């Protein structure tokens, strides 16, 4: 059962880079996998999680495929960015299948992302900021 789908694109009502005719990350020569906070899009993983029912995501499988916009070629060795990994963990998703080519796939156990916490590589307290969001109804 498919419980949700997601795509990479600008937030609702905003223009995509392809509509604007430029990408700020490309203009700044930012390598793939870095500085996604500068990207104007919402990643496919995040869009899928936003659209899904929480109960159905518990112990689910996420299928991820990335293609180059210009060529349509599969993005080999693709991986979720650190922000999407955190969202996948909190959503309760158990595994991620990543398509590397027409016939090649990898499976990642989300538990591995939990046990091998890449965010601990940062030691500088100045890089760490705590944010809290409170939701309330009126």
Residue ranges and their predicted role:
Residues 1-138:
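Zinc-dependent deaminase catalytic domain
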């Amino acid at each position: 059962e498919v419980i949700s789908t997601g795509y990479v694109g600008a937030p609702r009502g905003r223009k995509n880079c392809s509509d604007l005719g430029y990408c700020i990350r490309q203009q700044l020569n930012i390598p793939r996998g870095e500085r996604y906070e500068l990207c104007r899009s919402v990643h496919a993983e995040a869009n899928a999680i936003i659209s899904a029912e929480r109960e159905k995501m518990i112990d689910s499988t996420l299928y991820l495929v990335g293609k180059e916009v210009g060529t349509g070629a599969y993005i080999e060795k693709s991986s979720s960015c650190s922000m999407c990994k955190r969202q996948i963990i909190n959503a309760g998703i158990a595994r991620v299948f990543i398509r590397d080519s027409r016939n090649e796939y990898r499976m990642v156990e989300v538990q591995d992302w939990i046990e091998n916490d890449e965010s601990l590589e940062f030691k500088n307290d100045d890089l760490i900021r705590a944010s809290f969001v409170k939701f309330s109804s009126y």
